[in-house]
C-alpha cells in the first residue's frame, strides 16, 4: 500500500501571524469565511501534493478516486483510514462517504458507484412510503459480486427484487412506488450500458494518456468522453469544500483514504491547521500554525505583499508595529522557497504523465490563487505578516499497522 506518511516531512511546521491593515470592523461571518477558506485551500493543497506523491510512487491513476460529498466537520470519522470492502462495517462506512469517481475511468469503481447510487435512491423511494428499507448488509453481497466480476445487470436486478419484497405487504401506492423503483433500476442499467458501449474507446484513451500520446484536438469522440468521464474528478475537487480522496486496491478490495489525519478527529498530527489566536481588537490579528505544504501559496502571498506600494497614510496612522522591510520579507521568502523545494511540494513537477501533470499543476495554481484572494480582500496581505519555520518534536511517522 501507499506509505503516505513515510513520504512526507514532519520535521517542520510554519508559525504564521497575520495583522489587518484596515481599521473597519469585520463581521463574524467574514472572519469565519476567511478561516474556512484558509483551512479548505490548505487541505486541498495537501491533497494535491499527496495525489502527486501517490502517482510518483506507482499508484495507477485509475485507482485514485474522489467522493461526491465533502466530509462533515461535526463527524469524528474515527475509523477512517483503511477500509476493507470484504467486510460489512467497512462497506457501510464507504457507502456513507459518498459516490466514488476515479481519476481515470475504472470499471470496478464505476460499478460500485452505480450500485451505491441505485441502492440509495431505491431506499429513498421506500422511505418516502414509510416502508422498511433494504438492509445495508446487502451492500457486502453486491460489492463482493462486483469484486468477483459478476454481471452488474444481474446485481441491479437483485436490488429490484429486494425492493419489491420490501413492498409485498403494502397496499397504499404500491404500484406507483414499484414504478418509481423500476425507473431507478432502468436508469442505472442505461448508465452502465452506456459505459460499456464506450469502454473500448475509454481504454484506448487511457492507453494514449499512459503512452504520452493523448490528443483530443484530433479526435472529437475523445473530447466528448473526456468531458463525461475524465474531467469529473477535478470538477468535484474544485467544487467541494472538503473533498475526500482515496486509493482503491482492486486485488485486495480495500480502500485507503488519503490525508485522513485532516478528517479523523482522533488522528490529528502536526500538519493540522491550529488557530492559536484571533484578536478582534483593531487591528484584527490571526495567529496559527500550519504544515509546510502551504509554503508555495504563502510564498505567493509574500510576493504580492512585496509588490504592493508602501502603506498608505491612513494605515500609517494606525497604532501598528513597524511594517516589514524588503529585507525581512526577502528572508521569509527565502525560507518558504526552501520548503517549496521539498520533494512533496514539488511532486507534481515530476509526474511522468503530461496529461495528469498539467491537470494537477493547473489545480495547484487555482488553489494558490484561492488561498491568496481572501487574505488580500480582507486586508491581511500586508507588511505586518510574520512567518517562521519551526521544528517539531516528532520527525517521523509510521502508517498504521493494518495498512
Predicted regions and their residues:
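Membrane-active, amphipathic/fusogenic segments and juxtamembrane/transmembrane anchors
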Residues: 2-290
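Acidic, Ser/Thr/Pro-rich beta/coil linker or hinge segments at domain junctions
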Residues: 373-403
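Periodic self-assembly scaffolds
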Residues: 288-382
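C-terminal, beta-strand-rich globular interaction domains
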Residues: 1-4, 400-402
Amino acid at each position: 500500500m501507499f506509505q503516505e506518511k513515510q513520504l512526507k516531512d514532519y520535521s517542520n511546521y510554519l508559525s504564521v501571524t497575520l495583522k489587518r491593515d484596515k481599521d473597519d470592523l469585520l463581521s463574524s461571518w467574514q472572519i469565519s469565511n476567511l478561516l474556512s477558506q484558509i483551512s479548505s485551500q490548505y487541505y486541498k493543497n495537501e491533497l494535491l501534493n499527496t495525489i502527486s506523491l501517490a502517482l510518483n510512487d506507482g499508484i495507477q491513476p485509475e485507482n485514485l478516486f474522489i467522493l461526491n460529498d465533502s466530509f462533515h466537520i461535526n463527524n469524528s470519522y474515527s475509523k477512517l483510514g483503511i477500509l476493507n470492502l470484504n467486510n460489512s462495517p467497512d462497506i457501510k462506512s464507504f457507502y456513507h462517504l459518498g459516490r466514488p469517481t476515479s481519476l481515470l475511468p475504472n470499471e470496478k469503481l464505476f460499478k460500485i458507484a452505480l450500485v451505491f447510487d441505485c441502492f440509495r435512491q431505491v431506499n429513498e423511494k421506500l422511505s418516502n412510503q414509510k416502508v422498511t428499507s433494504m438492509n445495508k448488509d446487502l451492500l457486502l453481497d453486491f460489492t463482493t459480486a462486483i469484486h468477483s466480476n459478476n454481471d452488474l445487470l444481474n446485481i441491479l436486478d437483485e436490488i429490484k427484487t429486494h425492493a419489491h419484497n420490501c413492498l409485498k405487504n403494502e397496499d397504499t401506492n404500491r404500484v406507483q412506488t414499484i414504478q418509481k423503483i423500476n425507473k431507478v433500476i432502468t436508469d442505472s442499467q442505461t448508465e452502465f450500458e452506456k459505459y460499456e458501449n464506450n469502454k473500448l474507446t475509454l481504454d484506448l484513451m487511457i492507453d494514449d494518456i499512459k503512452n504520452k500520446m493523448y490528443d483530443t484536438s484530433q479526435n472529437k469522440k475523445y473530447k466528448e468522453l473526456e468531458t463525461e468521464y475524465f474531467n469529473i474528478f477535478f470538477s468535484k475537487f474544485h467544487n467541494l469544500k472538503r473533498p475526500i480522496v482515496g486509493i482503491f486496491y482492486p486485488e485486495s478490495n480495500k480502500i485507503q483514504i488519503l490525508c485522513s489525519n485532516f478528517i479523523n478527529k482522533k488522528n490529528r498530527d502536526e500538519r493540522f491547521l491550529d488557530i492559536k489566536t484571533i484578536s478582534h481588537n483593531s487591528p484584527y490579528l490571526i495567529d496559527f500554525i500550519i504544515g509546510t505544504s502551504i509554503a508555495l501559496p504563502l510564498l505567493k502571498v509574500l510576493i504580492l505583499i512585496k509588490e504592493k506600494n508602501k502603506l498608505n497614510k491612513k494605515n500609517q496612522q494606525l497604532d501598528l508595529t513597524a511594517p516589514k522591510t524588503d529585507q525581512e520579507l526577502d528572508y521569509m521568502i527565502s525560507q518558504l522557497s526552501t520548503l517549496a523545494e521539498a520533494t512533496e511540494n514539488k511532486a507534481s513537477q515530476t509526474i511522468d504523465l503530461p496529461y495528469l501533470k498539467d491537470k494537477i499543476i493547473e489545480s495547484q495554481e487555482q488553489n494558490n490563487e484561492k488561498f491568496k484572494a481572501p487574505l488580500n480582500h480582507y486586508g491581511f496581505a500586508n507588511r505586518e505578516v510574520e512567518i517562521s519555520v519551526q521544528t517539531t518534536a516528532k520527525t517521523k511517522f509510521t502508517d498504521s499497522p493494518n495498512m
